[in-house]
UniProtKB/Swiss-Prot annotation:
Residues 1-13 have a biased composition (Low complexity). Residues 1-25, 206-285 are annotated as: Disordered. This is Mediator of RNA polymerase II transcription subunit 4. One of its GO terms (biological process) is regulation of transcription by RNA polymerase II. It comes from Kluyveromyces lactis (strain ATCC 8585 / CBS 2359 / DSM 70799 / NBRC 1267 / NRRL Y-1140 / WM37). The gene is MED4. It is found in: Nucleus.
Length: 285
């Protein structure tokens, strides 16, 4: 009677797929190998393979069964740690989301910083702006008013008049400044808008002028009175002096009375006329 050969059993442990992707130990990453449960699974797999080989060769090894039991106990112990691994996985997923959010925010910040940097580069430097301002001020100082007026005349002659321009307005239409009539109208309009202020200013000026005039009139009156008194006194002194001289001349007797009379008649022709009159006849006496 011949012994039967090894028949593959459907329940053989060697035929079970230990991993869905049938990865070898070399293909597994080092990070996965560092996990304790993965090492226990590998050890459990190796012992089961050895046991299956011994059973297939009809030489079972009982020590392998003890190893399988030990590996099974370790697997149960590591399975109890799955709760911690689950928590760790949740924490990792949360950190991944947070990292993504931070990455998005940092990307947005970098984009805004880049746009700000570009806009700042487009702007001129402070030193350049100050230099340009100084140059412009120097150029403005050099420009003469006549040049500005000539340029304004050119603009006024060759540009269109505004739609609110009054064609019936008197004055030069080609000038950019208004005519004299429009200036007067503007002054009258401003005066009509500020009636009260102008009236109050005028009244204040009139009051001040009246006070000054009254003081001047009083001074003039006082000076006139003083001058009249002085003149009256001078006239009295002159009259007194003339009376004294006339009186003194009537009592003077000179030897050459004829010569004196002739000199007096030469000096005053009116006296000569009086002497020529025959007011009385000396023969009658």
């Amino acid at each position: 009677m011949s012994t039967p050969g090894p028949v593959p059993s459907s329940t053989s442990v060697a035929t079970l797929p230990f991993s869905a992707q049938d990865k070898t130990q070399e293909q597994v990453s080092e990070e996965l190998q560092s996990v304790g449960i993965y090492q226990d699974l590998e050890r459990y797999e190796e012992t089961i393979q050895q046991l299956s080989k011994s059973v297939d060769t009809f030489k079972p090894d009982l020590s392998l069964i003890d190893k399988v039991i030990e590996c099974d106990k370790k697997l149960y112990e590591t399975l109890e740690e799955f709760d911690e691994y689950y928590k760790i996985e949740e924490e990792l997923s949360r950190l991944d989301k947070e990292q993504k959010n931070i990455d998005n925010k940092t990307r947005e910040i970098l984009e805004t910083l880049n746009t700000c940097y570009n806009s700042l580069n487009e702007l001129p430097m402070l030193e350049q702006v100050e230099f340009e301002q100084k140059v412009m001020l120097k150029q403005r100082e050099k420009i003469h008013s006549k040049v500005v007026l000539d340029y304004a005349m050119k603009l006024a002659k060759f540009t269109r008049f505004p739609p609110t321009f009054d064609k019936s307005m008197i004055g030069p239409n080609n000038f950019i400044w208004p005519a004299e009539d429009s200036l007067r109208k503007g002054m009258l309009a401003m005066a009509s808008l500020k009636k009260k202020e102008l009236l109050l200013d005028a009244l204040d000026e009139d009051n001040v002028n009246n006070d000054n005039n009254t003081s001047k009139i009083d001074e003039m009156r006082n000076t006139n009175e003083d001058s009249v008194d002085d003149r009256f006194n001078n006239k009295e002194q002159v009259q007194d002096a003339t009376e004294d001289t006339e009186r003194r001349g009537s009592f003077e007797f000179t030897a050459n009375g004829k010569e004196d009379s002739e000199t007096k008649s030469e000096e005053n022709p009116d006296l000569e006329l009086d002497l020529d009159l025959d007011l009385f006849n000396p023969d009658e006496f």
